């Protein structure tokens, strides 16, 4: 199997399948997919503490129009219908973790448009 074939296979996976793949790779090779934490000194550490650069996007309430919220969740996460419905029905649920501020704000705005309540943590 070539690298290109592997990449194509990964592109076709859902978020849940990708999560399972990462966990299986971690177990198989005894590694962690977590990003290494760099120690920052002095003023740079204070600046980093002031403004967060990554956020978790949490669906706190689907609101009255669940169908539109499910469609928005599918569009934003790439999940299948069943997985998106489970997240919406089980709110509060984390949609995405460690998302850049701009993307997190965009996701929040799109979900708010369809009546969902979203929190950035």
Curated annotation (Swiss-Prot):
What's the source species for this entry?
Clostridium perfringens (strain SM101 / Type A)
State the name under which the record lists this protein. Large ribosomal subunit protein bL12
GO annotation terms (biological process): translation
**Molecular function per GO:** mRNA binding; structural constituent of ribosome
Family per UniProt? Belongs to the bacterial ribosomal protein bL12 family.
> Do you know which HAMAP family this protein is assigned to?
Ribosomal_bL12
From the UniProt record, list the coiled-coil ranges.
none
The opening ranks of the lineage are: Bacteria, Bacillati, Bacillota, Clostridia, Eubacteriales
| GO cellular component labels | cytosolic large ribosomal subunit
